[in-house]
């Protein structure tokens, strides 16, 4: 999807190509992880009618390890290589991952969950996933990164605008505000409620 396409408020996404999917993503504690320490709560594969057999197999592996994947079964392989044998391998891989799971719903696959036939919004609601950031201004710009010791949120006013108000973050602990212009750091005035 386009970076500017409508997306559920309070959530962000990164793009992932087949190389990252195949070689760089692992699953730990139900989260998809990169070697750099980035974590993701969900792998979303929208409207993908064709896939490589290796991609289907990797999705199955991530599911069995505990990932949450939002994807419907692909219809055909993304390559003609392998001829009829390649087609057969593709069909078998799809059967191992999706099997009879074609109706909209949540399905257990190994330790993971497969959300089939759902929009991203429907999958978020079905899994009761809470937004990372809540703000009265839907145009507020933000980015979240987590390290071993802290959650980091970079927050900026909407383009060509200003922001004044409360923002809720899905994390707990002591909060500091850092001014990127002058380097000033101060203790933020925070309250904690409902996981925020």
Regions found by a protein language model. Give the residues of each.
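Carbohydrate-binding surfaces of carbohydrate-active enzymes
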Residues: 1-196
């Amino acid at each position: 999807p386009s970076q500017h396409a409508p997306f559920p408020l309070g959530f962000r996404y990164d793009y992932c190509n087949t190389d990252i999917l195949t070689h760089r993503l692992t699953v730990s504690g139900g989260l998809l992880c990169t070697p750099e320490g980035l974590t993701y709560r969900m792998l979303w594969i929208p409207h993908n009618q064709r896939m490589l057999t290796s991609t289907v197999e990797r999705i199955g592996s991530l599911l069995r390890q505990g990932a949450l994947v939002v994807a419907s079964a692909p219809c055909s392989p993304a390559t003609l290589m392998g001829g009829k044998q390649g087609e057969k391998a593709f069909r078998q891989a799809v059967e191992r991952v999706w099997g009879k799971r074609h109706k909209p719903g949540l399905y257990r696959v190994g330790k993971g969950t497969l959300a089939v036939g759902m929009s991203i919004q429907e999958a978020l609601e079905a899994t009761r996933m809470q937004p990372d950031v809540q703000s009265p201004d839907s145009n507020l710009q933000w980015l979240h990164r987590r390290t071993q010791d802290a959650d980091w949120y970079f927050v900026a006013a909407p383009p060509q605008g200003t922001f004044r108000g409360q923002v809720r973050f899905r994390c707990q602990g002591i909060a500091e505000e850092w001014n990127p212009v002058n380097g000033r750091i101060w203790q933020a005035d925070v309250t904690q409620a409902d996981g925020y």
